[in-house]
Amino acid sequence: VTEAVYLIERMIDVLAQKIGVDKAEIRRRNFVRPEQFPYTTGFGWTLDSGNYHAALDKVLAAVDYEGLRREQAAKRADPACPTLMGIGLSTFTEIVGAGPTKVCDILGIGLFDSCEIRVHPTGGVIARLGTMTQGQGHATTYAQIIASELGLPASDIVVEEGDTDKSPYGAGTWGSRSTPVSGAATAVAARKIKAKAKKIAAHLLEVGEGDLEWEIDRFQVKGRPGAFKTMKELCLVSHTGNLPAGMEQGLNAVAYYDPPNLTFPFGAYLCVVDIDKRTGETAVRRFYALDDCGTRINPMIIEGQVHGGLTEAFA
């Protein structure tokens, strides 16, 4: 994706130079407009949402783009100026979350992913997935998804990956697909467990499921906040207690997730560099990175990935 974006962006820059239009303006003119979403591309992919104009405008305003252009023009007009000044601009839409089996199968193998969750009587959780972390923080991300769905502490959730003897089938870690696909499978599996726990809570509280509402870590009777069962209590009851007729013990679930579409995060990056005319030494003066990746499960991990990508580019 990086190489493809670089090629496209260089082509746009060359076009802007040839027709005498500012590089930011030519991009703005050719963006998909917000009111055009969902937008189907010439290749048949449907981009669900986006606001590319707002992203670009935010970046340009943050760095005072017009001021930078004036400074650049002044330096170019002054032969005695010891430095050259470059302004790099890149806007992109990334295709991630491969992918729908109907269009992304490899040798007949679909690119779905799966998650198996087992809940202990103590409220501890083991989640097994077919992906493998390479420094992206999978254990933290998957644990946070489960914690958010079930109201159990993330510190009590163990994530196991990469053991093909134990883990459910998955298409692996590549193409920025772990969270969109395996993460979604994790959420679906957790919701299956939550649905069963709700039935147990309704049985214990002697009310209908429709009379219950979820509040952080418990099911409580609507209008009666003192009548509730916590998820941790339900974990124990599911193994040892009085269950509804015909219900099996335990809180376990497996989910397979075949995404209906890819996901299309987008961004706008701007870099200002100064180059010493005599030595060729290059110094990055300013870098502004804007990404819209949708729901942020762990903002620190996202920021770390952006920092890592920028470091690679600098290197």
Predicted features along the sequence, with ranges:
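Cofactor-binding beta-sheet edge motifs in enzyme active sites
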Residues: 1-54, 61, 67-315
